[in-house]
Amino acid sequence: MSRDRSSLFKKSRRLGFSVLENEKEFNKGKKRNYAPGQHGQRRTKLSDYGLHLYEKQKVKNLYGVNERQFANSFKKSSKLKGVQGTNFLQFLEQRLDNLVYRAGFAETRRQARQFVNHGHVLVDGKKVDIPSYRVAVGKVIEIKEKLQKNAQVLRNKEIRTAADWLSVKDFKATFTRLPERNEFLKEVNDSLIVEFYNK
């Protein structure tokens, strides 16, 4: 699978927010309130299409998925009953790598994706090494015993708080329910993404 190898710092600076959601990619240099490049200060007003594209890119980069995965997730979630934008974001929230992150086992979604890729995560007792695996409500996510002793994982558990839609005990997290729209990504205008794909 192709991966976006571009600098997180450049990507976050271009989009105007922390892709990691913790500002760490800005630590090596002072965060600037303008776009990159020689004439970054002259950022022009986005067109209608630009606004829609920006919102799509924002969410795509937050969840760390490629264009094909993002479009496929939208297509599949569009078949569900309910509000299209909410369904789409909930669909992304059900990704295994995202839930490992939401449970507080990983500092970032990128780190959570590594844990899954390396076979350190179980779902209902079975190893799942596919980050995009869609976890159903009621399933139990668990960090393998070997990784439980990892200093970084232990630190993550100490400093991070699990999302309200996950019940966490030790290194197990039960996905109790889908999150309500007002509980996550409040800064995202999902209607712009819906309009982008429905045009």
Swiss-Prot record:
Domain S4 RNA-binding: 94-157
Protein name: Small ribosomal subunit protein uS4
Family, per entry: Belongs to the universal ribosomal protein uS4 family.
Subunit structure: Part of the 30S ribosomal subunit. Contacts protein S5. The interaction surface between S4 and S5 is involved in control of translational fidelity.
CDD domains found in the cross-reference section: S4
SUPFAM superfamilies: Alpha-L RNA-binding motif
Species name: Mycoplasmopsis pulmonis (strain UAB CTIP) (Mycoplasma pulmonis)
PANTHER family recorded: 30S 40S RIBOSOMAL PROTEIN (PTHR11831), SMALL RIBOSOMAL SUBUNIT PROTEIN US4M (PTHR11831:SF4)
A Gene Ontology biological process term: ribosomal small subunit biogenesis
Molecular function terms, GO-annotated: rRNA binding; structural constituent of ribosome
Family matches, as Pfam families: Ribosomal_S4, S4
